[in-house]
UniProtKB/Swiss-Prot annotation:
EC number: 2.1.2.3, 3.5.4.10
Pfam family name, one: AICARFT_IMPCHas
Protein name: Bifunctional purine biosynthesis protein PurH
Assigned GO CC terms: cytosol
Length: 535
């Protein structure tokens, strides 16, 4: 059994990196510790130009770099030095003049950055597939009992600290080994994804006609947290995040206080945050079981998120109990005070939190308070995944949204400016409500939300019941539907409760009947041409 605490001293290191962040300082410290350094190409030149003593790999192996750098480190004196088992292979290493290499610091050609450049063609992508680097990484990782492999610049400081204490323990080398295999797995997966989208029949080998979906789907996530249980107590669970999230979200959030996030907390907080990101003016979204139960935009700048919260809460005070609250502005003291004095809340998330607000929420020690950072107005394209038994559904994320200019008026009466504002507000909310989704809204406040019903007209009835229960007046509100109305009964029901304007995608075989129902009731209706199913 390997001793977990015995430290391995480092006498010889091989350094060859594409990303040179921190490498010069790392090499200088290694040199100061008496470590002999082998290096290649641009890394060797950087060290040499900055006074770090190093031996070029070509001089050590006696074999010059060739084929425009394609062959540099693929040599027995390199891989024998990395793979050689101390105490087992010593004689054969000595016979062939192979010196042990105790530490390998390598990161790989920037394949991802290359393929993301506009106009990248297949030959360019191929030249940025690293061969020698992954080979050294895997060799060192395989022989982690005797060799330390460092692929992340973030590990340089910790490695140096350990070397100054006498060397790296087996536990540390094992952790570095795991990071190395994760690194090469992600790299190979990225290459496979890319190559799987290239049109093989393209004579020019251009990648402009690439398929959107690769032949095999490879993606890597990093474990951020193990959870007490999953969606239900009998299920185990963990939260994994992307190495480089495309934009601000639940995966980038910092927890400032409160109990550990649960599986359901993460899912619900994601739903709340993604919804509130849809709004430009100060807004609040309250979510329960992944559905918005109250959403509002502050009617004036002075009201801020405090006023938005009051209006969102008023939509459904019962469902807000134990909910998730998200804001698109910094959480201030007044809003924090209003929340903690009024209701039980699981999670509060905002781009940032004032010190005064933190102090107020601290009085409720169990409340999970998160700051996620400010997001860009531009939504990043990304993939959505849905696991099915034996497979995975993959689609582009629904980042589609419309403006007033995109609306097609299909009724005799056109909506007023106020109705248009409310229609777009309700449409943004409906996008985040489980289908079939119906949202009633007035003055950019949700009046009633009907979610997740098998019948669209029943969702509309539930939205009206919710509004009545909350003491809110449906008459004079607008209605949003995430998909088309298959029959006119949805509009007849809307007329009955006093809806004045409707927004929906359109596209039903009976659109003419639905439009006629709206005209009969004097309801203005617009089509978006875009559906927002959410399952």
């Amino acid at each position: 059994m390997t001793d977990q605490t015995t430290r391995l001293p480092i006498r010889r290191a091989l350094i060859s990196v594409s990303d040179k962040t921190g490498i010069l300082e790392f090499a200088k410290e290694l040199e100061a510790l008496g470590v002999e350094i082998l290096s290649t190409g641009g890394t060797f030149k950087l060290l040499q130009d900055n006074g770090v003593s190093a031996v070029e790999v070509a001089d050590y192996t006696g074999f010059a770099e060739m084929m425009d750098g394609r062959v540099k480190t693929l040599h027995p004196k390199i891989h024998g030095g990395i793979l050689g088992r101390r105490g087992i292979d010593d004689a054969i290493m000595n016979e062939h003049g192979i010196k042990p290499i105790d530490l390998v610091a390598v990161n790989l050609y920037p394949f991802e950055a290359t393929i993301n450049k506009p106009g990248c063609d297949l030959p360019t992508a191929i030249e940025n597939i690293d061969i020698g680097g992954p080979t050294m990484v895997r060799s060192a990782a395989k022989n982690h009992k005797d060799v330390a492999i460092v692929v992340n610049a973030s590990d340089y400081a910790g490695v140096l600290e350990s070397l100054k204490a006498g060397g790296l323990t087996y536990a540390q080398r094992f952790d570095l080994m795991l990071k190395a295999f994760e690194h090469t797995a992600a790299y190979d997966g990225m290459i496979a994804n890319y190559m799987g989208t290239v049109n093989q029949a393209a004579e020019t080998l251009s990648t402009s006609g690439r398929s959107e979906f690769p032949r095999t789907f490879n993606s890597q996530f990093i474990k951020a947290q193990e959870m007490r249980y999953g969606e239900n107590p009998h299920q185990s669970a963990a939260f994994y995040v992307e190495a480089k999230p495309a934009e601000v979200g639940i995966a980038t959030a910092t927890q400032l206080q409160g109990k550990e996030l649960s599986y359901n907390n993460v899912a619900d907080t994601d739903a709340a945050l993604e919804c509130v990101k849809s709004f430009v003016k100060p807004a609040c979204v309250i979510v329960k079981h992944a559905n918005p139960c109250g959403v509002a935009v502050s009617p004036d700048a002075e009201g801020g998120i405090r006023q938005a919260y009051e209006l969102a809460y008023a939509t459904d005070t019962e469902s807000a109990f134990g909910g998730i609250i998200a804001f698109n502005r910094e959480l201030d003291a007044a809003t924090a005070k209003a929340i903690v004095e009024r209701q039980f809340v699981e999670v509060i998330i905002a781009p940032s939190v004032s010190e005064e607000a933190r102090a107020i929420v601290a009085a409720k020690a169990n409340v999970r308070l998160l700051a996620c950072g400010q997001w860009s107005a531009e939504r990043a394209a990304a993939w959505d995944y849905k696991r099915v038994n034996g497979g995975l559904l993959v689609q582009s994320r629904d980042i589609g949204m419309i403006s007033a200019d995109d609306l097609k008026v299909v009724t005799k009466r056109a909506p007023t400016e106020q109705e248009i504002n409310d229609l777009i507000f309700a449409w943004k909310v409906a996008k985040y409500v489980k289908s079939n989704a119906i949202v009633y809204a007035k003055n950019r406040q949700t009046i009633g939300v009907g979610a997740g019903q098998m019948s669209r007209v029943n969702s509309a009835r539930i939205a009206a019941i919710k509004a009545e229960h909350a003491g809110l007046q449906v008459a004079g509100s607008v209605m949003a539907s995430d998909a088309f109305f298959p029959f006119r009964d949805g509009l007849d029901n809307a007329a009955k409760v006093g809806i004045t304007a409707v927004i929906q995608p359109g596209g039903s075989m009976r659109d003419n009947e639905v439009i006629a129902a709206a005209d009969e009731a004097g309801i203005a209706m617009v089509f978006t041409g875009m559906r927002h199913f959410r399952h």
